Amino acid sequence: MKMKLAVLPGDGIGPEVMDAAIRVLKTVLDNDGHEAVFENALIGGAAIDEAGTPLPEETLDICRRSDAILLGAVGGPKWDHNPASLRPEKGLLGLRKEMGLFANLRPVKAYATLLNASPLKRERVENVDLVIVRELTGGLYFGRPSERRGPGENEVVDTLAYTREEIERIIEKAFQLAQIRRKKLASVDKANVLESSRMWREIAEETAKKYPDVELSHMLVDSTSMQLIANPGQFDVIVTENMFGDILSDEASVITGSLGMLPSASLRSDRFGMYEPVHGSAPDIAGQGKANPLGTVLSAALMLRYSFGLEKEAAAIEKAVDDVLQDGYCTGDLQVANGKVVSTIELTDRLIEKLNNSAARPRIFQ
């Protein structure tokens, strides 16, 4: 298989973790006879400094002619006092909109070697393997009007707006994902209060008729936020609207014990997607070899799975990550029992060693 990838390293530790992910990707693709062309582009603060905008047209052109996007991280205090239109995060929001990325997938998986790093009790997190599917392009964050009004601007209004099509496509995506996992889907809303949530629930029920093998349940967002802490292992796939998903996915991120481990995918209706780690740009450790590359590496694995259907290669990367952690190798943000803290580059070297060793083993059963 041949693929063309847009590579957007971004700011802070973004270039370091992106280098790691590209090295791992090249290894697993070469081992299995696939070919990738990588084309770098600017986004965020780096783009502001060089091109005067967080999302240059050249970057959009590169992304449009690519099969998928890999992104490192955007932002940092250097640009905090810029006008709103010149903030690094505007580049990310603009890219999502321009590329039609409406579904954010946030996998949350507990690793045996990191259970003690979780703020939750070991027995509550050891079997956690869930995905939060968040709608990205509608809801309160994009509704109009959104303004201050009245005398002295002492009244404020934000608008929560969704179309039927926007709700249908995100719920459809969640059912498709649940169907290839454990066939359980929790649709999260606030249907006891919000009209938008009542429509959301109606559409979920309509869509469920097409997926009789998937068990659909409805949960209120306040109950879900409690259950994510009390019993996270009950969840398989969670689907929800934009703001609820923003909050719940950040809450769920603490389960693993490190933001540095978490990948994410932003998808549209076809196989195209943008893949990035959940963590920020961490400018305080940029260039010091301390950055944890695993969230970006695991994001690359998601890319192979969802954009290219390369399940075997994606699983190989995920197994290499697990094996390296089992061997005790980690960066400083990870609390691995009897762990050996190594640099970004050395941790990447260990991953590549695992992948090459696995590829070199004779395959008795084909």
From Swiss-Prot:
It is found in: Cytoplasm. SMART domains: Iso_dh. Substrate binds at R96, R106, R134, D222. Mg(2+) binds at D222, D246, D250. Binds 1 Mg(2+) or Mn(2+) ion per subunit. Keywords: Amino-acid biosynthesis, Branched-chain amino acid biosynthesis, Cytoplasm, Leucine biosynthesis, Magnesium, Manganese, Metal-binding, NAD, Oxidoreductase. GO terms for cellular component: cytosol. Disulfide bonds: none annotated. One of its GO terms (molecular function) is 3-isopropylmalate dehydrogenase activity. GO terms for biological process: L-leucine biosynthetic process. It is an enzyme of class 1 (oxidoreductase). The record marks Y141, K190 as: Important for catalysis. Its EC number is 1.1.1.85. Pathway: Amino-acid biosynthesis; L-leucine biosynthesis; L-leucine from 3-methyl-2-oxobutanoate: step 3/4. Coiled coil: none annotated. NAD(+) binds at residues 76-89, 280-292. Its cofactor is Mg(2+); Mn(2+). Belongs to the isocitrate and isopropylmalate dehydrogenases family. LeuB type 1 subfamily. HAMAP family: LeuB_type1. Catalyzes the oxidation of 3-carboxy-2-hydroxy-4-methylpentanoate (3-isopropylmalate) to 3-carboxy-4-methyl-2-oxopentanoate. The product decarboxylates to 4-methyl-2 oxopentanoate. Homodimer. This is 3-isopropylmalate dehydrogenase. It comes from Heyndrickxia coagulans (Weizmannia coagulans). The lineage of its organism: Bacteria, Bacillati, Bacillota, Bacilli, Bacillales.
